[in-house]
Curated annotation (Swiss-Prot):
Role of this protein: Involved in transvection phenomena (= synapsis-dependent gene expression), where the synaptic pairing of chromosomes carrying genes with which zeste interacts influences the expression of these genes. Zeste binds to DNA and stimulates transcription from a nearby promoter.
Name listed for the protein in its UniProt record: Regulatory protein zeste
Species for this entry: Drosophila simulans
GO CC terms, sorted: nucleus
Region of interest: Disordered: 94-133
Upper lineage: Eukaryota, Metazoa, Ecdysozoa, Arthropoda, Hexapoda
Length: 268
């Protein structure tokens, strides 16, 4: 809209020394140009007369188009350009007005006298009028350089994005490696705990009984089933005292072949 154009023209005029390639300072930093464009975009989008948000590419394109089409009203020397333009328009109108009667007079002579006359052309002493497009070409060349400088900033943004992506990938790889190490440690701990539990179970199931110190009355069926010894069974003699005959001593010899206890099948 017209109000948005006026807002942009005002912002361009405010920061013209930085963004204009013809009027900017020679010793300027491209980061300052980037910050200036960001400030222009921020001020434009926060203006109350702006109906739609615009990004930096759209505003930079509008700036270049307005410069190329000579629609930017706040340029230095704009009054002189306008005065020279009005002088050009007036001279062109005068030349056209003088050319029309000459053409009519030429046609009149051709019809009656069959005499051809060359029209007289006015040559202006101002050399700039012969090439009205010279300023436009200069504008295009200078603004093309400005476009190349504007395009430098997105490359830096792309490099920064690539560096950030690489940093994120490295961080993710470190997190994944740490998680894998933790998982391996947990697996090792689980294996160690399982091995310790199996060792404890083996120790419980294969406990040794000293028959010489324990009487047969205190032995249970499970103790007899899990009974293991390093000596041959023929050398082991159990002295079992019968409850009814406390004084009598019966000597029982354990045979070589292990006999299955009748209650073993039930308890197993």
């Amino acid at each position: 809209t017209a109000e948005e154009k006026e807002v942009l023209y005002t912002l361009f005029h405010l920061h013209e020394e930085v963004i204009d390639i013809k009027h900017r300072k020679k010793q300027r930093n491209k980061y300052s140009v980037r910050e200036t464009w960001d400030k222009i975009v921020k001020d434009f989008n926060s203006h109350p007369h702006v109906s739609a948000m615009r990004n930096i590419k759209q505003i930079q394109k509008f700036w270049l188009n307005s410069r190329l089409r000579k629609q930017y009203p706040y340029r230095d020397g704009s009054s002189s350009n306008l005065s020279s333009g009005s002088a050009k328009i007036s001279s062109v109108s005068v030349s056209v007005a003088s050319a029309v009667p000459q053409q009519q007079q030429q046609q009149h002579h051709q019809q009656h006298d069959n005499v051809k006359e060359e029209p007289e052309y006015q040559i202006s002493p101002d050399a700039s009028e012969h090439n009205p497009q010279a300023d436009t070409f200069d504008e295009i060349e200078m603004d093309a350089n400005d476009v190349s400088e504007i395009d430098e900033d997105p490359m830096e943004q792309q490099q920064q994005q690539q560096q950030e992506a690489q940093a994120q990938a490295q961080a993710q790889a470190q997190v994944q490696s740490a998680a894998a190490e933790m998982q391996k440690m947990q697996q090792v701990n689980a294996v160690a705990v399982a091995a310790a539990a199996a060792a404890n179970a083996t120790m419980i199931n294969t406990h040794q009984i000293n028959v010489d110190q324990i009487s047969a009355e205190k032995l249970t069926l499970n103790d007899l089933l899990h009974f293991k010894t390093a000596r041959p069974r023929e050398e082991i003699i159990l002295q079992i005292k019968h409850p009814s005959e406390a004084t009598a001593t019966q000597i029982h010899t354990i045979p070589t072949q292990a006999q299955q206890h009748p209650m073993a099948t039930i308890t197993a």
